[in-house]
A protein has these predicted regions:
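N-terminal leader segment of winged-helix/HTH proteins
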Residues: 1-31
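N-terminal helix-turn-helix DNA-binding core of bacterial DNA-binding proteins
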Residues: 21-65, 92
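Basic, amphipathic "hinge/linker" alpha-helix immediately C-terminal to the N-terminal HTH DNA-binding motif
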Residues: 85-106
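Short, solvent-exposed amphipathic helices
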Residues: 101-117
Length: 120
């Protein structure tokens, strides 16, 4: 949304109840958890990536938190988990088609946040 008219129109549509916010609430509950958006971006940037490589992208993430977030993203069909029958077990993560669509929606948010942070 690049102009004020589009923002006003969206507000009017929301006020009139023409858009159900129920699906939005569900995805917001998942995406608002700490690390989730960043995990999606890291997977999107790499295409296919293993757990330990995701861990290395973040300084302070707990392995259990990363595991939980990846399971939630898989449950929401945003991430695909592929396990290989090898010893040791090898697991790779990639974005599903829905996850790739979500990246397209996240990019403007990240650009906005970067621009806002640069003003500080």
């Amino acid at each position: 949304m690049n102009n004020d008219n589009e923002v006003t129109n969206l507000r009017d549509v929301l006020k009139e109840g023409k858009i159900c916010l129920c699906p939005v609430k569900g995805i917001i509950n998942v995406l608002s958890k700490k690390w989730t958006l960043l995990i999606i971006v890291v997977i999107g940037n790499h295409g296919t990536i293993r757990f330990n490589k995701i861990m290395k992208q973040f300084e302070a993430i707990n392995p259990k938190i990363l595991t939980d977030r990846l399971k939630e993203l898989e449950k929401e069909n945003l991430v695909i988990r592929k396990a290989f029958a090898e010893v040791p077990l090898r697991v790779e993560y990639s974005l599903s088609n829905d996850g790739k669509e979500l990246i397209d929606a996240i990019i403007p948010l990240m650009e906005w946040a970067t621009k806002k942070d640069a003003k500080k």
